[in-house]
Amino acid sequence: MASREKTSIEGHMFDVVVIGGGISGLSAAKLLAEHEVDVLVLEARDRVGGRTYTVRNEHVDYVDVGGAYVGPTQNRILRLSKELGLETYKVNVNERLVQYVKGKTYPFRGAFPPVWNPIAYLDYNNLWRTMDNMGKEIPADAPWEAPHAEEWDKMTMKDLIDKICWTKTARRFASLFVNINVTSEPHEVSALWFLWYVKQCGGTTRIFSVTNGGQERKFVGGSGQVSERIMERLGDRVKLKRPVTYVDQSDDNIIIETLNHELYECKYVISAIPPTLTAKIHFRPELPSERNQLIQRLPMGAIIKCMMYYKEAFWKKKDYCGCMIIEDEEAPISITLDDTKPDGSLPAIMGFILARKADRLAKLHKEIRKRKICELYAKVLGSQEALQPVHYEEKNWCEEQYSGGCYTAYFPPGIMTHYGRVIRQPFGRIYFAGTETATHWSGYMEGAVEAGERTAREVLNALGRVAEKDLKTQEPESKDVPAMEITHTFWERNLPSVTGLLKLIGFTTSVTALWIVAYKFRLLRRS
């Protein structure tokens, strides 16, 4: 240890070193700097932003190949971005959305595709209602304390879907719902974790919707600007190309070593990287057993984000907005949104290759993926113009060694109740941020800001700069992006499930049969 201390950078002692220059780490550093804390950010990549990444070139002007969407109730990221001088614009859903299933295209309006089969409708309605009701039982800040936590954590979402749904159509869409929201498969994720994830995003409608939902808006100029503008404010307190390999808190001060053997000394550390990536760091003393087990059990989701550019927005000729929900195992893309610039320039469709499909299609050449996507769009939109793109951008997040995947880490069965409670617990003088540790919109930019600012306040409290009563803060609603209450009709609240309908039919049939028997018996007695 003595030799490490002697070679520390310029002998400078920082109050706090933040590991990770994504939105979570930088929002933590920003808040610390505002309290005149001597803070340094170490980022492994040659850029800031983490799982947000705005690419700029002559073909696209700018494009978000990572996290991009914000919406109502995401008040922290909206407040932070406004402070940084950023503006949002609404994702276009003025025209009709389309659902593609069994080789046919069905235009619709609203958050979810309509269901015309009455039995399937009951099944769909019961699915969303049941998931939301189960979510109400789960504390956002302590899902492992839910009344049925142990039972639900032993189940996969596939188990739960099979238990709730009677029809193939409902099971198929429920599986797609999991793919789209957490970029993983229903058989991979804990039912408890997924129900918690949906709940802390505001429920099934809020998380899936564009209008009044998680995908309502994007940032003019790209989401990467959030991190870039914080970096501009912090100046030389952000260092790029510094992967951290060693953290030693065995002495009075913490010593941090990077891959290129630079040493930094500080009083506190904030880790703002995905939980699984902390396994790349050597800790002294070693991590507690529960945290060590946790970080080995949280895989990242799998996604390839694809943007197809066209000469014109040809889909609008058919009164389509560009949003497609695609239920087809052979289709590369599962969901799309219009990615045209807010001024109408550079028409584009953004599509997600998700979960099992991301793994399968990653093995193909980029040009083959591009061709398959164009052929799919031509089929779904019924237009040969889809075969004539002018440019294509994509980002395979599975190959990013300093992310490991996107959007977020997921909990397999059994992990949340056994190890989940340590995800936000400090280890000595090391505090843990990152969107995975958030309790509201975890997995989104909003969760990243919440987690970063929480850990900053925890460190400020340890430094004696913030009182313990101020550790938890209530974020006021954004005045620029107000949330509308999500309501449900009388029928949505009260229609029976398929099981309930069958029981009702069985009961009424039994009552009718008994009445007939009793009536005939009375006639016999009279005769």
UniProtKB/Swiss-Prot annotation:
GO biological process: catecholamine metabolic process
Record membrane topology: Single-pass type IV membrane protein
Recorded name of the encoding gene: MAOA
Source organism: Canis lupus familiaris
Segments traversing the membrane: 498-518
Modified residues (S-8alpha-FAD cysteine): 406
The keyword Mitochondrion belongs to this UniProt entry's keyword annotation: yes
Main location group: mitochondrion
InterPro entries assigned: Amino_oxidase, FAD/NAD-bd_sf, Flavin_amine_oxidase, Flavin_MAO
UniProt-listed Pfam families: Amino_oxidase
Subcellular location: Mitochondrion outer membrane
PANTHER family linked to this entry: AMINE OXIDASE (PTHR43563), AMINE OXIDASE [FLAVIN-CONTAINING] A (PTHR43563:SF11)
Positions where N-acetylmethionine occurs in the chain: 1
Protein name: Amine oxidase [flavin-containing] A
Cofactor(s) listed: FAD
Protein's job: Catalyzes the oxidative deamination of primary and some secondary amine such as neurotransmitters, with concomitant reduction of oxygen to hydrogen peroxide and has important functions in the metabolism of neuroactive and vasoactive amines in the central nervous system and peripheral tissues. Preferentially oxidizes serotonin. Also catalyzes the oxidative deamination of kynuramine to 3-(2-aminophenyl)-3-oxopropanal that can spontaneously condense to 4-hydroxyquinoline.
Side of membrane Mitochondrial intermembrane, spans: 519-527
Entry keywords, A to Z: Acetylation, Catecholamine metabolism, FAD, Flavoprotein, Membrane, Mitochondrion, Mitochondrion outer membrane, Neurotransmitter degradation, Oxidoreductase, Phosphoprotein, Transmembrane, Transmembrane helix
EC number(s) stated in the UniProt entry for this protein: 1.4.3.21, 1.4.3.4
Protein family according to the UniProt entry: Belongs to the flavin monoamine oxidase family.
Site residues (Important for catalytic activity), renumbered to this chain: 374
Quaternary structure and interacting proteins, as annotated: Monomer, homo- or heterodimer (containing two subunits of similar size). Each subunit contains a covalently bound flavin. Enzymatically active as monomer.
Modified residues (Phosphoserine): 383
